[in-house]
Amino acid sequence: MSPKLPQHGTVGVRTPLVDGVEKVTGKAKYTADIAAPDALVGRILRSPHAHARILAIDTSAAEALEGVIAVCTGAETPVPFGVLPIAENEYPLARDKVRYRGDPVAAVAAIDEVTAEKALALIKVDYEVLPAYMTPKAAMKAGAIALHDDKPNNILREVHAEFGDVAAAFAEADLIREKTYTFAEVNHVHMELNATLAEYDPVRDMLTLNTTTQVPYYVHLKVAACLQMDSARIRVIKPFLGGGFGARTEGLHFEIIAGLLARKAKGTVRLLQTREETFIAHRGRPWTEVKMKIGLKKDGKIAALALEATQAGGAYAGYGIITILYTGALMHGLYHIPAIKHDAWRVYTNTPPCGAMRGHGTVDTRAAFEALLTEMGEELGIDSLKIRQINMLPQIPYVTMYAQRVMSYGVPECLEKVKAASGWEERKGKLPKGRGLGIALSHFVSGTSTPKHWTGEPHATVNLKLDFDGGITLLTGAADIGQGSNTMASQVAAEVLGVRLSRIRVISADSALTPKDNGSYSSRVTFMVGNASISAAEELKGVLVKAAAKKLDAREEDIEVIDEMFMVSGSQDPGLSFQEVVKAAMVDSGTITVKGTYTCPTEFQGDKKIRGSAIGATMGFCYAAQVVEASVDEITGKVTAHKVWVAVDVGKALNPLAVEGQTQGGVWMGMGQALSEETVYDNGRMVHGNILDYRVPTIVESPDIEVIIVESMDPNGPFGAKEASEGMLAGFLPAIHEAVYEAVGVRATDFPLSPDRITELLDAKEAAA
């Protein structure tokens, strides 16, 4: 099957985002901006302890305070929640026990902020403090108190999987090396703070939430379950959103609490979270220890791989089961590896819950693998770019041992592109002392083909409505979180219909108006919603072509649509304008509404015979190669990235402008994890709950990032497209790791490569000299 090729000049064109004007002019309304003059102020009381039993809560003084309208505790939230139906163990407000410092215990709604804060201070909670475990080692130690009764060893999930004969493959290897790497816990640091505006109509028993989410559908499900409401009485709207990066792919406690307060107060509650509270809500990438073992043949071919990954997952399950499976799932699909062994442990700790973050579950193990592969290649005398070329997939299509199907694979071209752009052959190993080059590969899924809450319905649905004015309304439940999905859906629909982009307006992520969608996570929207948009547009085009053919007294197959004109192929007749055809089409039906859907074929949904293969199952992979040029100050230990060349295989760049922006953002987030970002706790307290202490790179630290688009034309993607946002992130870490080694001769095993870590390595090198 070949992808549909664009013909009308809408797809493949650098296109500003359709909502860009509102954003840059300040007209965009984010959740905190929505007018609600009668809204009460919501506030949350949080645990001061990392681990404790709740013996008693007295809210009487808070309830008696003038201006307090509602007070809620865990007694009113008996239903647990969690993003995975098989692991729901978090309560909106803690019941019986708190498991991290910041765990919500009670909440109030009051007439103003001052009153709300006073009310929180009046709530008395009696705790029995318990030992707290900040690391997997401490949590798994014999005698440690279980955070959750059903997991007495504090291990949420163990994974043990083997593909191929690993022992035999290692026995045949000529070079075997093993190394352990650690990766600090990191946070998304999205620009917009968490916020929910909850409006309850007691007459109609209707609850409306405007909230900062990537997946309105999940919020809808969790609010309905925890509040024990009929889901038909709930409406969830995602206004403009200032980023997500995975943090907002779950229904979170503050959203449920806002709904609870609004219902109890019988009114409207605005619950705005501070930057510290937004950090505490967390869902970041967990601290991970990776023990990586690779066997190579003399010619550089990979014989076998064995990895062990241990993650500190935080206090609740969240995405943990999926995250730990992903540590091994994406060892497949990038290189040809005949034998793979994957052992992993996701461990509960008394810290805020971790979750999904850009490159979900794969970044740390990919970085460890790439770093060790580079080091072993050097030991064999093989250039780090060359050793990657040696291990490419042998043919396409390719089915991995994990049952993933690779239908497009632009990695060889990506490597050639960065090789040429960076001057690799001319400059590698020849830069001045203190400066170096490094290279790495990475990849990620174009959406998971096995949704988390799925009853067999299509993976994506898009509706198109055409009325008398000739305007086309595209309705999608997909959440545009800044990545440009509204623009993408408009572009592909306009391309199919042969109309101007300006003719299409998008309504998205409103459960009362738009079809259900599984949301913006795992880079699924372009592939799935894009294909559904094409399906809907083809349906609408069929209606219009039929009307035009009837009007022009021609066969439907002879009708062409060019620049909004419907013409008979080969005829000199000027044809009909779009508006004329709309008028003709509406004669019989009135307003025209059509539906388009997309469903991933079953062969792309994993293999039931392979345990866990639903995780990592996808329609296609985005691939990336990147070269990083960096320098190291040997006095301060500061690592500076000067230039990044990144070639990214996106199948087809539907909007090259957006692809470049998303790729640069992915590289930039990789740089943060590689060089400076780190979550630190002091007796359970997050010590960096602000963007001054949490070291996100600024524009000052950002290098020049040259994006090179590679188009492998995936046969199943919309016009050949795949994801273009996550596949490049992981490669930055091992690429700069190699650049640092070339610059000053030290190889770190702990990330980030912060000045203190680098100076320690330099001091040790000097002492050993």
UniProtKB/Swiss-Prot annotation:
Cofactor comment text: Binds 1 Mo-molybdopterin cytosine dinucleotide (Mo-MCD) cofactor per subunit.
SMART domains found in the cross-reference section: Ald_Xan_dh_C
GO molecular function, one term: 4-hydroxybenzoyl-CoA reductase activity
Reactions catalysed according to its record: oxidized 2[4Fe-4S]-[ferredoxin] + benzoyl-CoA + H2O = 4-hydroxybenzoyl-CoA + reduced 2[4Fe-4S]-[ferredoxin] + 2 H(+)
Role description: Component of a complex that catalyzes the reductive dehydroxylation of 4-hydroxybenzoyl-CoA to benzoyl-CoA. Reaction is not reversible. Is a key enzyme in the anaerobic degradation of phenolic compounds.
PTM notes: The N-terminus is blocked.
Family listed: Belongs to the xanthine dehydrogenase family.
Keywords, in A-Z order: Molybdenum, Oxidoreductase
Pfam families, alphabetized: Ald_Xan_dh_C, MoCoBD_1, MoCoBD_2
Entry annotated with the keyword tRNA-binding: no
Protein name: 4-hydroxybenzoyl-CoA reductase subunit alpha
Species of origin: Thauera aromatica
Record-listed Mo-molybdopterin cytosine dinucleotide binding positions: 214, 244-245, 522-526, 650-655, 722-725
Regulation of catalytic or functional activity: Inactivated by low concentrations of cyanide in vitro.
Cofactor: Mo-molybdopterin cytosine dinucleotide
Source organism, top-level taxon: Bacteria
